[in-house]
Amino acid sequence: MKFLALFVTLLVVLALVSAQKSQNTNHNVIVIGAKKPGAAPAAAAAAAPAAPPAAAPAAAPAAPEAGLADAPAES
């Protein structure tokens, strides 16, 4: 009976350890060298446009309905 209890306990411990290892996949990443504070990630650098952007168009005027929500209702 003691053997069965030890066997079940061992199985439970192994299952818990296995579950924890599968969740901690990013903790064993080795980083060599310090990260530079101004460095951009490679994906962001690749997605950046090669030419400077064109001048932005002027902002459109606000819609006339924008201020009507605060106006009191006329009856």
Curated annotation (Swiss-Prot):
One of its GO terms (cellular component) is extracellular region. Coiled coil: none annotated. It is found in: Secreted. Transferred from male to female during mating and may affect egglaying and behavior after mating. One of its GO terms (biological process) is regulation of female receptivity. Keywords: Behavior, Secreted, Signal. It comes from the Eukaryota. Residues 55-75 are annotated as: Disordered. Residues 1-19 form the signal peptide. Lumen fluid of male accessory glands, becomes seminal fluid. Residues 56-75 have a biased composition (Low complexity). This is Accessory gland-specific peptide 57Da. Its main location: secreted.
